[in-house]
A protein has these predicted regions:
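P-loop NTP-binding/switch modules centered on Walker-like glycine-rich loops
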Residues: 33, 47, 176, 180-259, ...
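Helix-to-loop junction immediately C-terminal to a conserved catalytic motif
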Residues: 46-50, 400
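Conserved ABC ATPase "signature" region
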Residues: 66, 118-137, 246, 468-486, ...
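ABC ATPase NBD coupling module
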Residues: 67-84, 110, 232-237, 269-275, ...
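Conserved ABC ATPase signature
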Residues: 141-146, 150, 491-495, 499
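Charged, flexible cofactor/metal-binding loops and thiol motifs
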Residues: 229-339, 352-360, 578-617
């Protein structure tokens, strides 16, 4: 299969020479980084490539019929009854002005012509199947009255209403909390078995693919580079990219000092900048000039395996069992003096009552943070962990001065700052506490060059006596975050996600920050980029002796880089200790539930889900 998009100037190949087979009742995982073409394959199967997208080679066959040759009426019938797709953002798939029940019964009424009563009975059945409580209330609710996890379950229920033969899931759990994600994945697995549905599961999370799929197809820059059964690819990988991908994720045992992650060098090629021969060539450790870049490389069958293929010329020359070369080990930096002290911090919000919050005219109190107390030292990484709504981002806002504390104290070098809003804080205090945000795409000014944005931060922090001094410091900051100096003249739109996040980090360190609050700084980035950005943060921390408050719900990364961990639940601290203490028994029950829900990309580790109940508010 080859799919291209056409602009006025050129043809942009999005998918080239791609082949995958999904057997009845089988789950196939499609793995790769942003831009590798995995969602394009899904849209190709749905025949929904838009005006400028076209299948330019190969066929998409469903139950023996070529989907590009069927009539629009037949295609509508197939989409309604036999192929269903679940998208990444559940709210985008639901009509906000229609009750859930009405949205669900539409499917069988339109496509199968059943009566409204029968459709309603089926809707009740699928709501029970997706393990949602209080069926009657759910069917009478609007989408905004449900949580993210409940919305995603409704979208799955909607897809199952037509009892499809093929279910395509495009990153269905990306926006969900780890315990909700684990419950949704378990649900998808069980329903696949119950309904005998085949699944095409698109994700960049190797742990999820391991838990849900039978076969895996690894994609890179528009091509499938390795396909095979889960055990073949995970345990006997035969492509340099698959190997590099596994080395850049924090599996159990990875440690920032003794076993650092190995980031994939270089950048992902844009569709019109692909190299000759092997697309992965410029980033590959085994690249050979003259052979790897001389001709297009076909998929090669691996001897002794029925369905294991790899797109690598040197497949028989590389020693795939060779131990991983350990990159330079780092000395553990001992923590210094206490920089930040939080003492019985409380943050309450008064919410005006309405139909949702009791009778009108009264006020309800939302306790976002309740008696938080802890210390953070120089050169230390303290991870703050918890699900959405646990109060970790509220705490970050109070620390930054964007909100003021209701009660309690925040001491920065023994100076109280908890009740001082950011506009009343001294410049030095503002420079001392900086933040790296979750989404690098939203935090840079699109109309300013990279250099100007960093210089502006230096001006705000009153750094340097002249423009030349500030320009020099800006170039030093680009060096610090390992970006070429010529990036100073580039606009944000010319940068990849990982490069934008590096600019965000450079800006945070512009005023010589003592404390950096990193709010999920790598969750919006690809797996291979995550390793590079995480290691960069660690390296800068060693040089600058910064205190890093790392807010995250990804326990794999927390385990890898933190010195101490604080677990939050509904505004309270439920556990606080060194990383080894928190990640070893005895656990607090909530910590254990969080740990059990983390998908691990290792076939020798068997996960068990302890918690699938809803989080209270």
């Amino acid at each position: 299969l080859s799919i291209s998009f056409f602009t006025r100037l050129r043809e942009i190949p999005a998918v080239m020479d791609f082949s995958v087979t999904v057997q009845p009742g089988e789950a196939v995982g499609l793995v790769g980084e942003s831009g590798c073409g995995k969602s394009t394959v899904a849209l190709g199967v749905m025949q929904d490539l838009g005006v400028n997208g076209r299948v330019v080679g190969g066929k998409i066959k469903f139950k023996g019929q070529d989907l590009s040759k069927v009539s629009p009426e037949k295609l509508r019938d197939i989409r309604g009854n036999e192929i269903a797709m679940i998208y990444q953002e559940p709210m985008a798939s639901l009509n906000p002005a229609m009750k859930i029940g009405k949205q669900l019964i539409e499917v069988p009424i339109i496509h199968e012509g059943v009566s409204e009563e029968e459709a309603y009975l089926r809707a009740e059945e699928v709501i029970r199947d997706v393990k949602l409580p209080d069926v009657d209330r759910i069917l009478k609710s609007y989408p905004h009255q449900l949580s993210g996890g409940q919305q995603q379950r409704i979208v799955i229920a909607m897809a199952l209403m037509s009892k499809p033969a093929l279910l395509i899931l495009d990153e269905p759990t990306t926006a969900l909390d780890v315990t909700v994600e684990a419950a949704v994945v378990d649900l998808v697995k069980d329903l696949g078995k119950k309904y005998g549905t085949s699944m095409l599961f698109i994700s960049h999370n190797l742990g999820l693919i391991l838990e849900t799929c039978d076969q895996i197809c690894v994609m890179y820059s528009g091509e499938a580079v390795e396909t095979g059964s889960i055990s073949d690819v995970f345990d006997k990988m035969q492509h340099p990219y698959t190997q590099a991908l596994f080395r850049s994720i924090p599996l159990p045992g990875a440690d920032k000092n003794t076993r650092p992650l190995i980031a994939i060098p270089g950048n992902f090629p844009l569709p019109h900048e692909r190299p000759d021969g092997c697309n992965f060539g410029p980033r590959c450790n085994y690249f050979q000039d003259g052979s790897c870049n001389s001709q297009p490389i076909p998929m090669n069958k691996i001897t002794g395996f029925e369905r294991h293929f790899s797109r690598c010329l040197r497949i028989n020359e590389i020693d795939w069992e060779a131990p991983m070369s350990i990159s330079s080990q780092q000395e553990k930096v001992p923590p210094g003096d206490v920089v930040l002290k939080i003492d019985n911090l409380k943050k309450y919000y008064e919410v005006a009552a309405n139909a949702l919050f009791g009778s009108s005219g009264t006020y309800k109190t939302v306790k976002a943070n309740e008696t938080l107390s802890f210390e953070a030292r120089e050169s230390e990484t303290l991870a703050i962990v918890g699900e959405s709504g646990c109060g970790k981002s509220t705490f970050a806002k109070v620390l930054m001065g964007l909100e003021t504390a209701t009660d309690g104290n925040i001491l920065l070098d023994n100076k109280s700052i908890g009740s001082i809003p950011i506009e009343a804080r001294e410049t030095e205090t503002v420079a001392d506490i900086q933040m790296v945000f979750q989404n690098p795409f939203d935090t840079l000014n699109p109309s300013m060059t990279v250099g100007r944005q960093i210089v502006r931060a230096l001006e705000v922090f009153k750094f340097g006596k002249s423009d030349d001094e500030r320009s020099d410091r800006m170039l030093q900051l680009l060096d610090l975050v390992k970006l070429p100096r010529e990036f100073a003249t580039r606009m944000p739109r010319q940068l990849s996600g990982g490069q934008k996040q590096r600019v965000g980090i450079a800006r945070a360190f512009a005023g010589g920050a003592r404390i950096v609050v990193a709010d999920e700084p790598v969750s919006a980035l690809d797996v291979s980029v995550q390793a590079a950005v995480t290691d960069l943060l660690m390296e800068i921390q060693r040089k600058e002796k910064t205190t890093l408050l790392f807010i995250s719900h990804d326990l794999s990364i927390v385990r890898y880089l933190s010195d101490r961990v604080m677990v939050m639940y509904l505004g309270h601290v439920v556990e606080l200790g060194t990383t080894d203490q928190v990640f070893s028994p005895p656990y607090h029950p909530y910590t254990e539930a969080l740990l059990s829900a983390v998908p691990i990309a290792d076939t020798s580790v068997h996960a068990k889900l302890l918690q699938s109940r809803q989080v209270t508010s």
